[in-house]
From Swiss-Prot:
Keyword Oxidoreductase found: no
EC identifiers of the protein: 3.5.1.5
Protein name in the entry: Urease subunit gamma
Location(s), subcellular: Cytoplasm
Species whose genome carries this gene: Paraburkholderia phymatum (strain DSM 17167 / CIP 108236 / LMG 21445 / STM815) (Burkholderia phymatum)
GO biological process: one example: urea catabolic process
Amino acid sequence: MKLTPRERDKLLIFTAALLAERRRARGLKLNYPEAVALITAALMEAARDGKTVAEVMHYGTTLLTRDDVMEGVPEMIPDIQVEATFPDGTKLVTVHHPIP
């Protein structure tokens, strides 16, 4: 299978997000990379599902709470930026304070 660098990045994000989902389901608090991967993958999927940029940005703030992550993680993630594929093309999505 031949993948472009962007496709490899997306696959890596998805894999890390899947691991984060499993750990969260077991009741573990997520660390920084797990939280970023979970939010990033969810944003990419929401865009692919046809949501608008504004909807994806808002959705990004509803995925995790402070109770879901280790202490200090929300402060380490002031914003998340991801290039997501929407029905009308690729756009940069920025979510400010994704873990309120």
